[in-house]
Amino acid sequence: MSKLSHSEVLNTIRNGLIASCQPVDDGPMDKPEIVAAMAQASLIGGAAGLRIEGVDNLKATRPTVKAPIIAIVKRDLPDSPVRITPFLQDIDDLAAAGADIIAVDGTDRVRPVTIEAALKRIHELGCLAMADCSTLAEGLYCQQLGFDIVGSTMSGYTGGEVPNEPDYQLVKDLKAAGCFVMAEGRYNSPRLAKTAIEIGADCVTVGSALTRLEHIVGWFADEIKTAKV
C-alpha cells in the first residue's frame, strides 16, 4: 500500500488516467519485471495511477512506485463467469502485496463469494473497494453497499457482441447518481479518454491501447493491409 490516506488516493486519481498494465496472457511481456517497468513508464508518461493484475505482478510493482494501485486477480472458473478477484483469499493476497484499491466483479452473476462479503473483507484490510459493473442497477447496488469506486468496466462483456464504443451513458448515469466513477472499457484513444472525463467520469482506465503491444501493433498492421496502392 502507498503511504497515502484513502482521501489522498481518491484525490490523486481524480480527473486522471489509470494505466492498466496487463500484458497479453502468456505473451513475451507477461513477466512481473516487465509489468513493473510498464508501470514506471506509464507514470513517467503522466498516469495518475495503475491497475495491476496478479499478486506476483503487484509484488514486483509496488516497491517501484508511490502512485495508487488498483489491484485484481483474474481467474477462469468452471462454475462461474466471474473472473475478477472472485475469492476472499485473492483479496487477502492483494492487500498483503500492497494494493491501495482492490477491484472485484460487481455484476449480478453467480459467484463463489458474495459481493457483500468481498466488500467487507476489502475494508477490513484497510483498502479502498472498487466494483467492476456492467449496468446502472449493478452500479447503484454496489454504491449502496459502500463501494468507494464504481467502474463501467464490465459493460459489454457479460454476453452478446462486444460494442466498439465505450458505454458513455452508463458513466453519465453513475455520475448523476453520485458515484465516484471509473470509466473503463474500450477507451482506446486519447479522444475517447478525454470524453470520459468531460461527461463526468472521475477518472478513466486505459489498458490495451497502452500496454498490450501485440494489440497495438495489430491495429496498425491490419489497417495498413487495407491500404490501396
UniProtKB/Swiss-Prot annotation:
Pathway this chain belongs to: Amino-sugar metabolism; N-acetylneuraminate degradation; D-fructose 6-phosphate from N-acetylneuraminate: step 3/5
InterPro entries documented for this protein: Aldolase_TIM, NanE, RibuloseP-bd_barrel
Cysteines joined through disulfide linkages: none
Keyword Cytoplasm part of the UniProt annotation: no
SUPFAM superfamilies: Ribulose-phoshate binding barrel
Keywords of this entry: Carbohydrate metabolism, Isomerase
Enzyme class: isomerase
Pfam families: NanE (PF04131)
Function per UniProt: Converts N-acetylmannosamine-6-phosphate (ManNAc-6-P) to N-acetylglucosamine-6-phosphate (GlcNAc-6-P).
EC number(s) reported in the record: 5.1.3.9
Catalytic activity annotation: an N-acyl-D-glucosamine 6-phosphate = an N-acyl-D-mannosamine 6-phosphate
Isomerase listed as a keyword: yes
Chain coiled-coil ranges: none
GO molecular function: N-acylglucosamine-6-phosphate 2-epimerase activity
Domain of life: Bacteria
Protein name according to UniProt: Putative N-acetylmannosamine-6-phosphate 2-epimerase
Organism whose genome encodes this protein: Actinobacillus pleuropneumoniae serotype 3 (strain JL03)
Record's GO cellular component terms: cytosol
Gene Ontology annotations of biological process type: carbohydrate metabolic process; N-acetylmannosamine catabolic process; N-acetylneuraminate catabolic process
Family: Belongs to the NanE family.
Gene: nanE
